[in-house]
Amino acid sequence: MKITNILSRPEPTISFEVFPPKQEAGLESVKAAAGAIAAMNPSFMSVTYGAGGSTSKLTVEVASDIKNLHNVPVMPHLTCVASSREHVRNMLSQIRANNIDNIMALRGDLPKDGVICNDYKHASDLIADIRSIDPDICIGGACYPEGHIECEHKSDDINFLKLKVDAGCDFLTTQMFFDNNIFYNFLYRIKDKGINVPVLPGIMPITTAKQLSRSVALSGTSVPERFRAIVDRFGDDPDSMRQAGIVYAAEQIIDLIANGINHIHVYSMNKPDVAKDILKMLNGIV
């Protein structure tokens, strides 16, 4: 099933993201976690892609398990910073061979060895190539309500986003944010630029202070005072911090749904217990 079909539904839905193991030795534990989340009947699941394509085989394997063993629609990620055109074609062939209808097209983070491929300069180039190879596949793209961490001017960031959509991107998923007003303002700004594809908000439940520090360092996401106070108060108490983080994420989701945003993507970090607790708090809403 295409994700655009899911996003056209009027009822609220929740989807989850998982990531593949860095080594094949961890594959079975990731499959087990993904299977546990799939059993919660999300609208779809996404599977990330290691820096420089380091986990491309495992990404497809986990995604195939979700789709073909658990019968949950799935969206594997594909990055282009270290990918050749031949590799992209091979990945698309593998994805289609596993009955998968969706792909998330990204530039991706630089690999640790610094080796890149110059076949694609931007995510928009990758999206255009995927669309030319497989006109029927559903393509997702990333967007950044506070601007990409590497982009100096927000206006430039939205111009790059317009290029993705014009290249054939069917819908967008946001980087995490902790203040819903930032997301609402972002929707107004992109609409003014003529970007009218569905935008799926990405919510990350923060369960430890360390997770917050790392996430902010990587993404540049701002932390509102209300959430900062929560981390300051509960950060040294693991159980309380976990619960407070889940409550905060659930409150974000409830506010989004109350304001007409019916489809939410949760960065569940391979943690079925977190996904389960989020859904428990949303019982009767989703």
Describe each PLM feature range:
Residues 18-21, 48-52, 77-83, 108-110, ...:
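Active-site beta-loop-alpha junctions enriched in small/polar residues
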